[in-house]
Amino acid sequence: MERKLRAYSIIKTLFVLIALATAGCHREVAMPPLPLRNITLSDKFFDVWPTSPTRAFIVGDRGKVLLTEDGGRTFKRIDIGTQLGVFGIQMTDDQNGYLCGQDGLVMRTRDGGKTWKRLDSRTHLFIFGLSFPDTNHGYLVGDRALVMSTTDGGESFIKRQLQRLFPPEISDYALPYEEPVLYSASFVDVDHGWVVGELGRIWATENGGKSWQEQQQSLLPQWKRPLGPNDDARFADFLLPTFFSVSFRDQKHGAACGLEGWVIQTDDGGKTWNFAHQADKPGAPLDTLVPGAVQIPARDPLFSIDLFGGDQGMSTGLTGTVLRLQPNGAWAHDPSVPAVPFPLSQVRFFDATHGWIVGYGTILYTEDGGKTWRYCQG
């Protein structure tokens, strides 16, 4: 009997404690919901395109498109009607623009980005980059050596593959080399453009994509990585690093960047390309340039490059890497950019003064040419 009374007492005490914990001394007040934020650490932003010193579009994963009109102090989210990843965006003027992305996604706006219409790209391949020299003419690149072009603002597309064909007896072995992924395009007008991608591919056209020429051959004598015991000499020119981004300021001057932190440059339209020196900081001694040598410590991949303002340039990459073009043609780590431990996917300047850097959970804005940067919280 005593044991039952003790058990009853314990149960009663527990109920009292639960009641007190639930009710407390005051009436419970409903907490307001947390505000919805346009920028979170889980966001993956892939590209940015400014249309004025303070107005810019930013695109990313899960169909996310943001617009700021006040230099990143506030953002408006634009519903584009898809959850597909958006990898690239370009506005050709204040009203007209295009974006591209996952599963053949191509969309167009004609009202300044308020609404977006999906275009029939006739492909389900990923489209990683685009370049529109004007509102009607554009070029898009992607998986399996895909290049698409339009001359009517996306009403129709011409598709082709920039592939290298090998003899039938080695076609199975050569399959990964025949259709490399193309990541980036840069056109300075409707005729002259460049495309870069996997395995060091560089292609150029001077007639609006009617024909293309490979340009990476000038890099091969500079590349000092020897063939391995199982490497086939017929694939020697595929040992170059993958290039993720290319930027041309005119028909002569361009740069590209990619794996292992390499930057290449040309001042003759790509007839010759050269690997660029790098430095730990502005004014520091340059590295010993041995392209292809194993880097210790390893250098971060570079995902984007932008030539702007006549003679300036920046490049961004993994774990917050930011390089700045120096007067001597070398690239140095830029200490003015806040340390960010996340990938920085894209740098883009509107002019020599106003620019943006976007990446994973990160949007940065400068209005003094990159001397200082401001985090945009949205």
Language-model features, listed with the residues they occupy:
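Bacterial N-terminal signal peptides that target proteins for export
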Residues: 2-14
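Bacterial N-terminal signal peptides
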Residues: 12-22
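Residue-level hotspots at or immediately adjacent to binding/recognition sites across diverse folds
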Residues: 25-378
